[in-house]
């Protein structure tokens, strides 16, 4: 390390990788966050990508980013502003400069700052020559040229060579934070095991970026972020959507029930459906419905026949599910509706996060239709809240809304893998043949009715959205009975509010 290189000890620091969609910024950011987690840092991440499948290259609308917040304590958020920004082209700089702190180190790919790219990004002149950057430590590096130089004898075509340039930037960042390239080298060799020439090229460029940063002393600062003091255990990096899916798997195991997910794909909730679709080995059934209404209705049907049933969506989909959610309230069937919130209203901001669906979750149904609402606060505790949402739904025979959001769902953090024995049992109250069954006879403690599965002799009863007579379950239009049932449904949910979930909450730092 050069004597001119300043070593700065930091409690925490935010790094933002940005470039065109297709520049590999998501992979680059994920690799750095994984390496930081393996080092022992607290980590929180957030991918930032456009709603369009592929906006025109070099435009601000096509910029993809990945933000990583690391620290020597557990980290709860991906951070507000970046201390280090990697911008692979002018559009990435324009889109992300406002998220860089004054004095931030900005590494730019100088090769991308052509007149054409500068114009496409919306600049009137080269921003690298503008006073707008005078408050930042700008490090211009010919990343594309240096990548081509490293691979000139590789035998790869030009397109394949240029694709490796994100690894050069990652190598520089690894040096900047005193991290080894070992984790990413192993990842590349495993990922491209059947394409050794691609693996070799990416590893060579990764090491070239690291060596360039260490030898030419282009970077004037070197950051030191010590490992965090965390509870001992086995950890992995997990996104909120994956943690949500796993929480439901754990709940199904504890309840000894099959798990069913009926959903329509919607950003940013789709990963939950995709994760559960991989777990047929655990008896999970998934159904990709033709629309939001079909998704929730299949889940209500699955609940009726004895499954732990869930449906996943975001704000616009929650609006479409509202009538069927009211059916689940009226039928008093267990169901979990997961709302991974995004910016609204209407289509809104599909890939941006927002927490604006609370009132819709509480009141967005016709009539008086009370429903418990629980909300996660970190990617990791999405597991806990999914588990508890399922437990509440099953033991209290009610639909439940679980609120997360785009940051929680797509963001990631180190997560201590729990033991199922540390979680409480989940006890479905299922009526059996020979019971003196009354459809709306209630448990005196919870006011929950019994779960009667179709096909069980002697448990035939009416089901559906029409009001029922208390206890007997006959259809009724009598106002006095409707008031009784309305009060009972309200009282049942009010009892749930007394549950203490404090033991699954995490301390705030």
Give the role of each language-model region:
Residues 2-255:
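Active-site cofactor/cluster-binding pocket
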Residues 12-100, 164, 246, 251, 259, 341-368, 483-505, 509, ...:
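Thiamine diphosphate
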Residues 49-50, 205, 226-230, 264-268, ...:
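A glycine-rich phosphate-binding loop feature that marks nucleotide/adenosyl-phosphate handling sites
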Residues 51-52, 149-151, 218-233, 251-258, ...:
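Gly-rich Lys/Arg/Thr-decorated short loops/hinges at beta-loop-alpha junctions or inter-strand turns
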Residues 108, 311, 337-338, 402, ...:
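Structural beta-sheet core signal
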Residues 133-136, 140-146, 352-405, 425-433:
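Conserved thiamine diphosphate
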Residues 238-247, 255, 385, 390-505, ...:
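Flexible, low-complexity linker and terminal segments
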